[in-house]
Amino acid sequence: TANMEWADYVTSMKMYNEAVANDNNWNQQIKQSVINAWSNAFDTGNYGPYNDVFPQVDWWDELVKPGFSQQYNVNISGGTNFMRYFASIGYQNDGDIYDLQKQENFDPRNYYRRYNWRSNLDFNLTKTTSLSVNIAGKMGYRNDNFADDVYTRIIAAPTNSFPIKYSDGYWGDGSTAGYNPVCNMNTNGSQLYKTFQGWYDVRLEQKLDFLTKGLKAAAKVSYTSASTTRSSIKTGEIWGNNDFESRNS
């Protein structure tokens, strides 16, 4: 995912003043004293995503990170004249592209983890009788939070209206000045989906060459199982500085 490039606040204010001046809306211009204060903050380094007075937040940089996907697989096979076997175990882990932190009572991170397995056993019970036992399955875990329209909210969030957090520990005040995506994605809860699928079959085969050459009889028993569960924790939605909007589900 490509990073976004943003103009700094001083440049934005100067461009805004130039735009309104072109329309002769002089009374809408930002005061030069405000621009000078911000310019001094940039010159002295007194600004940043956690600065109470001069917040400068690159929401994209704060939230978006490179994602990853991992896959592992192990196979074993072998056997004797009496029995042959094959077994396979796999694991897949798709990580999050958002830089979120696990909370005390829930995990808002987005991820998908899957385990899959397969085992085949073939027995030569006699010269004319064979038995096959096959087992396969997979189990998946998909976790996410309740944030929606994330990309649009990150792009639309104001970069200089409030910090991510104030020095007193409260979240930046998104209730009156916009939306705090770092706060919302980390604090509004999580939901975990668990899925399971299993396949089982047993096949018995008997050669009947004594009746007709190449004739065989076979019997097969199969069973399939599947389940899906969802567990969720939905907190109240925190919009900003000591501002709590209760929303439970």
What positions do the PLM features span?
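Extended hydrophobic secondary-structure segments that form protein cores and membrane-embedded regions
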Residues: 216-225
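Membrane-proximal, glycine/serine-rich, low-complexity loop/turn segments characteristic
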Residues: 1-197, 203-209
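Short, glycine/acidic-rich hinge or "gate" loops at secondary-structure transitions
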Residues: 214-216, 236-237
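Carboxylate/His-rich catalytic cores and anion/metal-binding grooves
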Residues: 226-235
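Solvent-exposed, glycine/polar-rich loop segments of beta-barrel outer-membrane systems
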Residues: 235-246
